C-alpha cells in the first residue's frame, strides 16, 4: 500500500520536476551579453559593415583577402519597401540586404494593430540578413565597399490576383560586369527566392562566391511570452548531411565557432514562435558557418567558387525564410526545417498530437475546445486501462479497514504485515500498483502537449472563453490552477486513505503544491490537466460506487 502510493506520487513529482528542468533549459535566460553593451556597439557598427561578410578561402577561390569595411550608408528613408499579403520588408540598396521584415498576419501584442516585426535595423536592435557575392571578383569584396544597387522604384506591392512579385536590383561594376539581384515574393508564403544573375560583359573570366547570412545582436527576444522571467530559446540552428537539426547558441558561436562543408542543409536563427533561415541550393557544395564578430552573432553559408566566361551569364540562387514556425510552410521550404518547431525528445508523440489537435480545431474553431476534445480522445483510448486501475483503487479503498486491522494486529512486525497484506491482495485480486497506471500513462501525453503549446505558433494569441484570451500564456487570474488543485483534492477523496498519518498529511499538501507549481504554466496546458482530472473523477466515482454497491 505505502509502496504503491510513494511510487504513484513519486512518478508524478519526478515528471513535474523534469518538466520544470526542461522548461528552464529551453526557456531559461540565455547567456548573452548585456543589452546596453549591444546598443552601445550599434552606434559604432551598423548592419552594413562589410567586415561581417565571410572571407572566401583558398579552398573555394583564389582570393583570400579580408573584406574591407563599407563606407556607404543609406538613410532609412531611401529603403526599398515591399508589401505582400504576408510580409512587409525593407531592402537596403547598399548590398541589397533585407533589413526589416514585419509579419502582417501576426500582431506584436494581443489587441494591438501593429504587426510583429522580426527583422529590423535600428538603434535598439540589429537583426538583418545579408547576401551577395564575395571572392576574387565579387562586388561585395570590393575595396570601395559593398555595391549600391539601383531599382526601378522604391515601393512594390503584390497586387490582388497576382501570385508572385519580382523585385529587381541592378548594379554595374567598374569592369562593366552587370549584376541583377532578384527577390521573388509569393502570395501566402514566407519564403523569398533570391536570384543573383551575373552578366559578364568584360573580357576576363569572372570568379566569385555566393554568400548569405543572418546577423543578430544579443538583444532579448521580443516575441517571448513566458513568465517568471524565463525566456524562450534564442539562438542559431544548423542542418547538414550529418545532423538533421542542431542548436547553436550565441555563446557557442563565440566560444566554439562552427565551420562545416555540406551539400544539403540550412542555417537559421530561432526565437519563440518565429524563425529566419537561409537555404542554399540543395546538392551544391557550401560551407556553413556560425561565428561572432564583435557584438554580433552571424550564421550563414558560402558557396564554392563559380567561374563565368566573358560574354556569358550565370545565376546563383538560394531561398530565405522569415516568418512563423508553421510546420506546413517549413516542410515545403526545406528538408528538416520543420524541426525548428522543437518538441524535444517526445517529438514522435507531439507531432501526431499536434496533428490531431489541429484537425479538431478545424471543426470547432476554438483551440481551447480542441484541447478539451483531445483529452476526451485520450481518455477514450485508455478507457479500459484506466477502468482497471480505478477498480483496483476502489478495492483498496473498500478493504482499507481490513488493512488497518492488519497493521494494528502485527504492529512493528513489518515483514509479517507485508506477508498478510500480500495474501489479502492475492485473495481479493487487488493490484497494489494498479492505481499508478492512469498517471503514468498520461505523463508522456502531458509532456508532449507542453511542448506543443510552447512551440506551436498557431496557439499564440489563441483565445478560449471569458477571461482566457491567450492559451499560450499563464492564466491572468490563476483560476485554472486553482480549479486544478480542487480537482486533485476531489480525486484524492476517492482514493483509499493512507494508513500513515504523515503520509496522509503529505498527500493533502500535494494539490496545493501543484497548484502553485502550475500558476505560471500556459493556460492551455492547465486546461488540459483540469479536463483530464474532471473526466478521471467522473470515471473513478462511477467505478467506486459500483464496487461499494457490490459489497
From Swiss-Prot:
It is a multi-pass membrane protein. Residues 34-50 have a biased composition (Low complexity). It holds the Pfam family YidC_periplas. GO terms for molecular function: membrane insertase activity. Residues 34-68 are annotated as: Disordered. InterPro entries: Membr_insert_YidC, Membr_insert_YidC_N, YidC/ALB3/OXA1/COX18, YidC/Oxa/ALB_C, YidC_ALB_C, YidC_periplasmic_sf. GO terms for biological process: protein insertion into membrane; protein transport. Signal peptide: none annotated. It comes from the Bacteria. Residues 56-68 have a biased composition (Polar residues). CDD domains: 5TM_YidC_Alb3 (cd20070), EcYidC-like_peri (cd19961). Interacts with the Sec translocase complex via SecD. Specifically interacts with transmembrane segments of nascent integral membrane proteins during membrane integration. Belongs to the OXA1/ALB3/YidC family. Type 1 subfamily. Required for the insertion and/or proper folding and/or complex formation of integral membrane proteins into the membrane. Involved in integration of membrane proteins that insert both dependently and independently of the Sec translocase complex, as well as at least some lipoproteins. Aids folding of multispanning membrane proteins. This is Membrane protein insertase YidC. It comes from Marinomonas sp. (strain MWYL1). The gene is yidC.
